Structure formats: C-alpha cells, structure tokens
C-alpha cells in the first residue's frame, strides 16, 4: 500500500508511522498480513480516539459508521499536532509521498521530463507515478531562468504573467496552482514596480483522481490500471534588462498509472455487520 511503500522515506526524516482505524483488531491483523504492513495499526472500534481528533466521518452509515475522515496528522514528540492533511471530500486523500513533499519541500521528487525552451529550462516532476482512485498527487514545474532574465508573476498588470495551465482528463480534478512569493523589480525605463520571478522557482499543483466524479468511461479506464496523461502548458513572457520577448508557451505532460481500488474484504467471520 502507499503508506507502507513510503515508510522508509518517512523514517529517513526521523518520523515514525502509525495508523488508526475504526476496524477491530482481527480485521486490521488480516489487512496487515495481506498487504505486508510493517508499521503499527491501532484498532479504535468505538471511535473514541477518532472523535478526540475531531475527524469522525459524519456521512458514514451502516457498516462504515464510526469511520474516520482519511488523512494525516504530523505529531511531535510532545504530542502536539504540527500539521494536518485532509481533503474536503472523504473520498479523496493525499498520498504518502504527497505528504512527504509538503513536509519537506527540499526532497527530490520523481523527475518526469526536462525541457529546454526559449529563455528558460523546465523540469517536471511528480510526487507519485502510481495511484488509486481518490488519490491526491502533486505535480511540479521547476523553472530555471538565465542570469538577468525574469518573468512576471500572476497578478501583474500590463504584462503576460507566467501561468501553469492543466487540461485534466475526465474523472480528475485539479486545485489552483501554487506560485512562490515574487520579488518586486523596479523598471527604471518606465518608473514602474512589477512583481517578477528570476533565477529558479517552483510551481506546484495538486490533481485528484476523484472517485465521486468518475463517469462510465473514466471508471472503465481507471479500473483496468492504464496510464493516464495529464497535459497542459506553461505560458510566460521573458524579459531581460533591455528587451521583453514575445509571449511563449511550453507544452507539459505528466503520466499516472492508475490502479483499481483493493476491494477485497476480510473473512466473513470478522467483517463489520
């Protein structure tokens, strides 16, 4: 499973993993055995701990009653919650590698492609290559500009800002792109201050394989474990000390291997009734 596969990466940062579930101990033992889980899985059949963390899923009914909203807490050695990562919809969840990237932005993500374009170098990476429906994945575009060259940040007036535009396939949804804080550049020639990026900077955008939005075609695609492409473009206008070059666009592409959900249940004798 995703969390087990990321266990070593967390431990290299000095973090230990534990999971908690409303399932009884026999169910968790069966699950851990089938998936070779090597971190503690804690049974909370009355959802007392789940309620204490205020993550009880109010929409869960029947045999799922008592279930927690899926997500992550980063808790320090004193028991203080330092960070938490939960999606608005209980069907969606961040992947473990996604959370590592949010906790430790300096960690290298898996590089997808490197593109040499007019006045910039673009490196594409992603938090995960293999996901299941409901996963939230971070796509990253690292931009490297030559010396004395800048591009304009979103929000600039009168110039073409840098903009990452994604065309997500059916069944996927994207959140707004996240840009770094710009620096303010004073343009002596026109006596004007403008927000810009120079040197190297990173743009991030999360995409979600949304279970609730899967149509018949997308559901069939994702259920077979095929590769899904996310394409788009990086639009920008590069300028140096004397010239603003014509607006340009670079195509971008990431690929995800979407595996079907594991719907196998524990033996009937220990299942939720």
Give the ranges of each region predicted by the language model:
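Short, acidic, Ser/Thr-enriched surface-loop or helix-capping motifs
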Residues: 44, 75-76, 241
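Solvent-exposed coil/turn segments that connect beta secondary-structure elements
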Residues: 23, 45-47, 78, 169, ...
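Structural microenvironment flanking redox-active thiols in thiol-disulfide oxidoreductases
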Residues: 1-40, 45-48
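Short, charged, surface-exposed secondary-structure boundary motifs
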Residues: 49-54
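Extracellular/lumen-exposed scaffold segments
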Residues: 100-273
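Thiol-/selenol-based redox modules, centered on thioredoxin-like
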Residues: 64-124
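Structural micro-motif
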Residues: 36-40, 55-61, 65-73
């Amino acid at each position: 499973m995703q969390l087990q596969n990321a266990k070593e990466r967390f431990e290299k940062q000095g973090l230990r993993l534990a999971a908690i579930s409303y399932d009884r101990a026999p169910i968790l033992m069966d699950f851990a055995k089938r998936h070779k889980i090597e971190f503690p899985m804690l049974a909370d059949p009355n959802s007392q701990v789940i309620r204490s963390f205020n993550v009880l899923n109010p929409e869960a009914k029947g045999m799922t009653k008592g279930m927690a909203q899926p997500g992550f807490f980063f808790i320090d050695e004193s028991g203080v919650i330092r960070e938490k990562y939960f999606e608005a919809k209980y069907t969606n969840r961040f992947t473990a590698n996604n959370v590592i990237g949010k906790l430790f932005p300096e960690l290298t993500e898996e590089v997808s492609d490197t593109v040499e374009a007019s006045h910039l170098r673009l490196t594409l990476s992603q938090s995960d290559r293999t996901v299941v429906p409901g996963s939230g994945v971070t796509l990253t575009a690292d931009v490297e500009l030559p010396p004395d060259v800048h591009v304009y940040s979103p929000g600039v007036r009168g110039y073409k800002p840098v903009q990452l535009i994604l065309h997500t396939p059916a069944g996927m949804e994207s959140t707004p792109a996240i840009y770094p804080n710009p620096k303010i550049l004073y343009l002596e020639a026109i006596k004007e201050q403008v927000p810009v990026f120079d040197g190297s900077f990173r743009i991030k955008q999360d995409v979600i394989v949304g279970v609730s939005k899967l149509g018949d075609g997308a559901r069939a695609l994702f259920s077979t474990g095929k590769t899904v492409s996310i394409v788009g473009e990086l639009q920008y206008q590069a300028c140096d000390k004397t010239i603003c070059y014509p607006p340009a666009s670079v195509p971008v592409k990431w690929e995800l291997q979407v595996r079907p959900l594991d719907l196998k249940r524990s033996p009937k004798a220990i299942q939720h009734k």
